[in-house]
Amino acid sequence: MMKKQLSIFILSILLLLIVGACSKNENRFPANGVLIIGDENHIGAIMNRYKENMKVHEAFSVKTGRFDQKRVLIINESTAQAMINAKIFRKRDQASLSKTLDTLPNFPKESSLLFINEEEKNIKSIEIEGSKVPVTYGSDAWLGNKRDYGALWYIIVAKNSVYKEIKANETNMQLLHLKKSLGDENPKISTDNTLINEKVKVRKLIRDFEEEVSLQFVTIADGL
């Protein structure tokens, strides 16, 4: 009887150690960065909110539009590389998991790279403001910890020279590196609503510009 109880006790300890190890390896996605897309006139309140917590501020020129009523973000190769370096360009790894995108695929001739759901990989061009942008499927990838369908749907990465020729609305993308995390996207304690509460507060700041501004909390692998 004693041996049986001892065996159960040892198994229980091993189970706790395994669960603890899995928990430790789980990516909680601490929100140590903010990715904002929109005109500077519309994002002043957001910038002010994080001014004291800001470690590094990166700014990029980007282009936006709509295709089939869905948002399109167009960035050049240099901007895409900056997102890769920050480890916020992610791609589908398995059905429900993702990993960072380490490199861009090779650019096909006379075409830009399209990042979208694999189901739409056969799209050959994206029409924006009456002009067609030839594209080739890159991978099922997005900017941010998880794909935010409300913020972005299609991402086009163009060579720097090609990007200049694409006619679309020009705006700004800001990547804020924060000194202190705003909370975890996958908190250790399920009742931890720190990041959720922050999202509610910041959404109120842009409620009048929801169609013009996109905002995501991101996890930056910060070497800056």
Name each model-derived stretch.
Residues 1-6:
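Positively charged n-region of N-terminal signal peptides that target proteins for export
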Residues 25-224:
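Basic-flanked hydrophobic alpha-helices used for secretion and membrane insertion
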